[in-house]
Amino acid sequence: MFTFKNYYYLYIENSKVLNFNLIKTRNKFNIIYRNIGKPENITQLKKFRQKCKQKAIGFFIANNIDLCTKLKADGLYVSAYSKKILNPRGFNMRLKIIGSAHNLKELGLKKKQGCKIIIFSRLFKTNYKNKSDFLGIV
């Protein structure tokens, strides 16, 4: 989970893990749906999207413009591993584009990709294997 100016971004991998009754505050939470494993049923995701609208929760799809437009999501999340420059004419202009970056090079790429909000991660030293660098507070 990341926080940005009193907004909270929750990463989920399937629509069954979130209990909407636990979210009491409106217009502060955003869900980023990343489908890494088994693909979900579109009708189930549409129901999940509808619940997000009812609770005033922002709904973003990770790295999938087609799914983003099918579900009429609030926006697109571009992960740090996505290096492709987006063509804004290819999708609805009202979509918010957010992204994540792990270093200054990726930060520049996210700006080129049109991200309005960039989640800058790994600010502090961690003990993760193969991830020894950290940025510090910028």
Language-model features and meaning:
Residues 113-138:
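Active-site/ligand-binding-proximal alpha/beta "capping" segment
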